[in-house]
Amino acid sequence: MLENLRYIAKEEGLRRFKESLIAYSADLGGLIAGLIVFLRLEVFLSEPWIVMLYPIMITLRGNIGGIFSAKLSTSLNLGYIRPSLRRNTPLFMILFSAINFISLLLSFFSGLIVFLAQIVIVGFKPWLLGIVLLTSLSTQVISMSIAIPVTCALGFISFKRKIDPDVILYPIMSTVTDILVSLTYTVVIIVVKTLIGFIAIFSICIVSSSAILLLMKKYGREVEFVTSVKQILAPLLLSLLIGWFSGLALSNVKSKLEEYPSIMIVYPAIIDTIGNFGASIGSILTARLAEGLVSPKLSLSLLELYETIQMWLSALLYFIVYAYIAFLNGFQNVGVIIICFIASSPLILFTCKLSAIGVFERNLDLDNFVIPLETTFSDFLGTLLLSLFLGII
């Protein structure tokens, strides 16, 4: 075994470590998202529902963006979509319509379940339903209206320059969407509490929702639209439920966030890196399963073990950076941040293997299930462990 491991180490070198070190560098952009929230933390912590909804928005937007990025990349490589925003193929418009419809539907459900949780926490306030739903819908609508064109432009440019969109789209866009969601969410929760702001945001939601429903009316009967919605909706609904538990965990330590505000600076970067650690493993595994290079079993081969250790060490370096940033901003218990990753990584690895094997054996689309479920579970686990450790200290 040791001889085989030495041979693999000699053949592979530190390739995965270097690749993941570069890939995870995009997660540093999550610090910008965290800084946006940190600068208006008093507004963010003013209501339990605001704290609760934020992780759901981050998780939901990331998963929808991840699925869109994966499908766009695959379709570009297969020639089903042209690298142009104008006069593209019908499949592009069907994919565009399906993603927007699902985003609208899930943002409505997000606001609804957060409102129901708010009833349990502080009691029934009927007027709050409109504010929570409007906040959820507008955050998704506004961020989607920017994120989708940016995703398309980045995918088209990279494809034209013979750079594989599969390699760069998801890591870059996951960070971009975190920043977009954090900025949009912060602006919305400030503006929605004023009459003029409420009317303006309500108008944006009505116009955008009407446009999405018109697209659905035009393309909703297409086989590709129905198939995409059916396949994507199930894992995203599960992601939404798990994201809700993340929100509950974070809202339960609201007082600790007030005591240690610097945690919010690094929080988006923490869950991004945990998620991308799992996504890296999941992407490699799903590709090898699809190509028949590995057998569907839970145990790790020596090659998988060697690659996982490299990616784990790469992610650990970033967690040390996050701990140092939190320390510079007044958080003394820096070990909490590092332990979050160390404790969560074995469970994330197990979840990646289990979900990939389960989806593969049922002959389902790996892109639609493995990455969304893995990133959602990673977000939840990172948030849960961070909340638990904050509750203890």
Annotate each PLM feature.
Residues 18-37, 109, 238-246:
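The first (N-terminal) embedded transmembrane alpha-helix
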Residues 20, 24, 51-63, 100, ...:
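Transmembrane helix-bundle signature of multi-pass membrane transporters/permeases
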Residues 37-54, 58, 253-267:
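Interfacial/gating helices of multi-pass transporter permease domains
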Residues 67-86, 150-171, 257-261, 280-298, ...:
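Juxtamembrane helix-loop transition segments at the membrane interface in multi-pass membrane proteins
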Residues 69-121, 273, 277-330:
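Helix-loop-helix junctions within the multi-pass membrane cores of secondary transporters/permeases
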Residues 129, 133, 138-146, 151-181, ...:
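Membrane-interface helix-loop-helix junctions at boundaries between adjacent transmembrane segments
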Residues 135-147, 197-209, 336-337, 344-345:
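Structural signature of hydrophobic alpha-helical transmembrane segments
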Residues 231-295:
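Transmembrane helical segments that form the transport core of multi-pass membrane transport proteins
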